[in-house]
C-alpha cells in the first residue's frame, strides 16, 4: 500500500513538470525610460534659462499689524440681527428707491383721478374794430364797434358711463356808431347746458377710466416690488450677519490654534531636554506655529471681507461712522429650525411670494387693457342733448338814424309806431331777465357718430395684442409657480442637509479632540512621534472651524427657506407698509 502511494506521488510530480514546461516563459519587466524630446534631450537639460534676480533671498521682516483696515478696534459696535435688519431697511439705497417708486405711483393715481375734477374755464377780453361801411342803409363811410366779452364754462366727466357734461355762461357788451343799430350799447347773455353720452364706444371703458384703473394697479405693483426688495434685503442681511459671526468665531479658533501650537512647541522642547525627542523635532513644531500664525491673518482677512459686506448693506452712505467701527454680533448662533412640511411650505410660498403678486397685478392691468380695447372696437355713436337760454338788453342807440322810412318816422302816433316802441322796450334793460325766465330757449337732441369705412384695424390689432399678452402672463405665472416649487423644495433639502452636516461636524470635532489628546499622551510615553501629534492638532483646528461653518450655514439655510416661502418679513417682525 505504501509502495502504491509513492508511485502515484511520483507520477503527479512528473505530470506537473511536463505541463509547466509547456507554458510560455513570462516576459521580464524592463524599466520605463524618462521622457525625452525627439532629439533625445531630457527635460532637465532643455535650453539655457536666463537668470532672473538670482541673488533674491526672503529676509526676515516684521509681522504686519494684526488689525482691520480702516477700523478702530476700540470702537466696538454691538449689533443684533434685528438691529441690522432695521438699519438696512432704513438706510439701504435699493429700499429707498422702492419706497420712492411707491410714492410716485401714489401721485400717478392722484393725477389720474384729477380728470374727474370739474374744469372752470373762461375768457375776458376787449375788442375795438373799425371796418368800411358796405351797407346801403348807412351813410357813414366806416363803422367803429367796441366789444367787451366775458365768457365762462364749467365742464366735467362723470366717473361712470363716460358721460361728459358742460355748462356755459356767455356775456357780451357791444357799442357801435352804426346809425342803423337799434341798441348801443347792446347787451347779450346766454346760459347753456350740454350732455354727451357714449352709447357704444367709451360707455363701459374710456381713456380716463383706463388710466385710473392702471394707476391703481401700478400702485399695487410698486407695493409688491417694495416687499420683494425688502425680502431680498432682509435675506442678504441675515446671510451677511451669519458670515460675519462665522468669520469672527473662526478667527478665535485660529488664535486658539496658535496657542495650542505654542504650548506643543514648549512641550516638545521639554521632551528634547529630557532626551525623549530629537532636536530636529522642534523644527516641525515651530513650522506648525508659523502656519497657524499665517492662518490667523487669513481669518482676519475673512473677517474684514464679511464685515464690509454687512456694512455695505446697513450703512446709509460711505461716510457713515459705522465704517470706522468694529461690528460685534451679539445674537446666539443657534437658530431654531422651522418644522414645516413640503405641502405647508408650498401653501405659504404661493400665498406670500411677491413674484406671484407682481404677476397678478400684471394680469389685472392686462384685463383693463382688454376691456378698453374691446370697447374701442365698437363704433362711436354718442347721444347729444343741449339747452340754451338767451337774453338781450341795452340802451336805445342815440345816433339811430335809418335812411329808410319807419312807422315812427312816418306817423309817430300810429299803432304800428306804438308797437315798434313796445318791441324796442322789450329789448332794453338787463339781458338776464330773459335768460332766467327762459324767454328765448333753444333745445337740441340728436346723435353723432364716427364710423371707419373699412373697420377699425387699429382697435382690432390692439385688442388682439392684449389677448396674446394675457396668454403670455398666464404662461409666465405657470413658470413662476414651478420655479417657486423648485426653490422651496431645494431650500427644504438644504436645511435638512445643513442639519446633518452640523451633527456630523460636531461628532468630528469631539473625536478630533479626543484623538489629539490621546496622541499627545502617546508622545509622552514614547509610543508616537511629533508628526502625528501635529497632524492631529491640524485636524482638530479644522474640525472646530468646520463645526462653526456648519452652524452658520444652517442659519443661512433657514434664512433662505424663509425667503423661498416669502416669509422673511414676518419671521423677522418686519412691517412692509411704506412710510
PLM feature spans:
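Bacterial Sec-pathway N-terminal export signals of envelope proteins
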Residues: 22-147, 195-210, 214-216, 241, ...
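Periplasmic alpha-helical coiled-coil/stalk elements that build and connect Gram-negative outer-membrane
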Residues: 112, 224-344, 494, 498, ...
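Acidic, low-complexity, intrinsically disordered peripheral segments
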Residues: 4-9, 20-48, 128-130, 308, ...
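Sec/SRP-type N-terminal targeting helices
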Residues: 97-100, 113, 160-188, 201-224, ...
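Small/polar, glycine/serine/threonine/aspartate-rich low-complexity segments that form flexible
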Residues: 69-76, 124-193, 328-338, 371, ...
